[in-house]
A protein has these predicted regions:
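Gly/Ser-rich catalytic/binding loops embedded in alpha/beta enzyme cores
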Residues: 1-101
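Fold-level recognition of mixed alpha/beta catalytic cores in primary-metabolism enzymes, strongest
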Residues: 84-149
Length: 149
């Protein structure tokens, strides 16, 4: 499976689309990543995000622009737009995104895939935060995107 770029994956850069964080290679994985890998999941890629996960599209100066695979002139949405685009293009079957203000739901809608914003706290956000940030967002949730419900 793939995972949104903003999740910590040991040995992989986690930039949140910010060029200042381009060299931020984490040495430990997010709790959700650890649980997925313990269950046998193989992560084979991270998907694009807008700068600081704060836009309705998925462009950043680190990785460029994610495009909607149904029409490359259109956005796949944001902030989990890279996730939804990868699913719609058939590059992956499942992706882990995050959502505060429709960051899973809008990209899923734009790309014709399924996205779920679960109840807050169902999945731990540990490891899905900017470097050196101790507190977690009190409204951010971790959730899945898939090709279908």
């Amino acid at each position: 499976m793939t995972i949104k770029e903003s999740y910590n994956v040991a040995g992989s850069p986690t930039t949140w689309g910010d060029p200042v964080l381009k060299a931020n290679v984490t040495d430990c994985s997010a709790l959700s990543v650890e649980r997925l890998e313990k269950a046998g999941v193989v992560l084979f890629g991270k998907t694009n995000v807008p700068l600081m996960l704060a836009d309705y599209q998925s462009y950043n100066a680190v990785y460029g622009t994610a495009r909607n695979p149904w029409n490359i002139d259109l956005t796949p949405g944001g902030s989990s737009g890279g996730s939804a685009a990868a699913l719609a293009a058939g590059m992956t079957g499942i992706d882990a995104g995050s959502d505060i203000g429709s960051s899973i739901r809008n990209p899923a809608h734009y790309c014709g895939v399924f996205g779920l914003k679960p109840t807050w706290g169902v999945i731990s956000p540990k490891g899905h935060a900017l470097p050196n940030v101790v507190a977690y967002g009190d409204i951010s949730v971790i959730g899945p995107l898939t090709r279908g419900a």
